[in-house]
Amino acid sequence: MQQLRKDQKASWEEMMLDTTLNARIQAFLDKFEAALVAGDLDAAVAMFAPECYWRDLVAFTWNIKTMEGRDQIREMLNSCLAQAKPRNWKIADAESATEADGVIECWITFETEVARGYGLVRLQNGQIWTLLTTMVELKGHEEKAGFTRPLGARHGVNPGAKTWKELRDEETEQLGLKTQPYVLIIGGGQGGIALGARLRQLGVPTIIVEKNARPGDSWRNRYKSLCLHDPVWYDHLPYIDFPKNWPVFSPKDKIGDWLEMYTKVMELNYWTGTTAKHADWDDAKKEWTVVVERDGKEITLKPKQLVFATGMSAKPNMPQFKGMDTFKGEQHHSSRHPGPDRYKGKKVVVIGSNNSAHDICAALYEAGVDVTMVQRSTTHIVRSDSLMASIADLYSERAVRGGMTTAKADLIFASLPYKILHQLQKPVYDKIRQDDADFYAGLTRAGFRLDFGDDDSGLFMKYLRRGSGYYIDVGASQLIIDGKVKLVAGQVEEITPNGVRLYDGKELPADVIVYATGYSSMNGFVADLISRDMADKVGKVWGLGSNTTKDPGPWEGEQRNMWKPTQQEGLWFHGGNLHQSRHYSQFLSLQLKARYEGVPTPVYGLQPVHHKA
């Protein structure tokens, strides 16, 4: 009984503390709102700490933009405040502010003139350190969900009424042939599918074109052993989560089947067997003319918005080594690798040392193939178990059981400014290096050249900066440590009739050469489909401008050209991993919906082009 009284007292004290903290935060939000409503920029900016960050996902800027420091915040407010008219800043329903290590954190809601928003604020010493504001929905153009979901059935007597299937068939037969889509998405992988699903729920006429025969074939057609290296909790699509018994790491064919199912149940207008041939922008009509070939027949589409969702791994980067035309054996890019089965008893050289190279080498070894990896530059490796532990607070079964939702996890991750993210990641990877010291020592003894990024900030920063240069270890590293997969470090001088010659004179005999040499930027597709001039106009896609390897400066603060307006009106890029495809599809779809409905979308801070395609 005495313990019960102690527990009750502690619970009461915690409740009072939460109530007091909530009251303080709401008073702070009220003061912030009053300054914004009054247009008092001095008062509003003074509520931010000297080091501060405001990341806005569409709500204020109609852009994806991070303001770093008080001066940038003042400039944004000076430009956007009159149009946005933000108000009703509140602690989010069923949420309470929390305090730890001198930082108060709180989920918030707010409104603008045209939208409702959600955000996350962090205070230090009574001032804003980080603020995330995101657009959730457009007023008057909300998704039909929950209480407003479609009825589906037509009850009562309705002479001549069409069934759901008849209406769906009619739409399928007309869109793109008798009526035009407002949005055309080129690429039907997870990026195009996630965006298509969002636009479908928002009532925006959209067609997704995919060159493969079935949805999901972009996964099915990859090498046999491919599985996702990200865990299931990180990889949900919008609206439909994976079942609770879904494997932690999804095999490629299972993901392919899920994507195919998803396109059907989400009622996407998905054209398979369709290749985009050419596109032109008509500035007078503000529309695109896109010629596609569908099942051998050319069709001309006239969308207002064109989205490239061709993927980070869709345009193979095939090297041009001297002597490739003389090789007597089989050679192909890793994207065309059929799997290991037909190579048993042969010698295979895999040029490259990132994810695909490791996966292919491991599968070849397991199939009884004599396989050698050629490492041309350093590679960052992190064990899958260690990576999962580092994100377990957001994406794990433990996180789910603790009340963490996918949407919240995404927003927490999005709320961390890129400018300081490397500082937050470095101690994570310092610990991983310490915990996995024996693992890394074994790789070093085997001759593997390791890195942890230019500033030791690890996997996520390397991915965000360049999208390459790493391997999430699911077993291949031990094969290298044990010498079962042979490793050679060096640069390729030429391909000979019988193998590979390195600059140090070493000869590697080969029956098969696999070029696991990565992929080029998505705007390479712009050059192919539209023109080189257009690709140069929009500039490089991906990267932060961190001035690290393969991510030249100046600092951009956000991913170049991704999920936001580009220098070409009506041209957009969408993609990334499953997490990014899910999360950012929300904000790209709202930008497109607003334009479809004629909602004013004055873009603040359109990204200048510093690097051509």
Q: For the regions a protein language model found, what residue spans apply to each?
A:
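Short, low-complexity N-terminal intrinsically disordered segments enriched in polar/charged residues
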Residues: 2-46, 50, 169-180
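Short beta-strand edge/turn micro-motifs at domain boundaries
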Residues: 2-8, 14, 107-109, 114-171
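A solvent-exposed, acidic/Ser-Thr-rich amphipathic alpha-helical stretch
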Residues: 22, 34, 38-100
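A short hydrophobic beta-strand element
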Residues: 99-110, 288-290
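A short, basic/flexible loop-to-alpha-helix module at the beginning of a structural domain
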Residues: 155-181, 332-345
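N-terminal Rossmann-like FAD-binding beta1-loop-alpha1 element of flavoenzymes
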Residues: 174-208, 356-365
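Flavin (primarily FAD) cofactor-binding/catalytic cores of flavoenzymes
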Residues: 181, 204, 209-211, 252-355, ...
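Conserved N-terminal glycine-rich FAD pyrophosphate-binding loop of Rossmann-like flavoproteins
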Residues: 213-241, 379-402
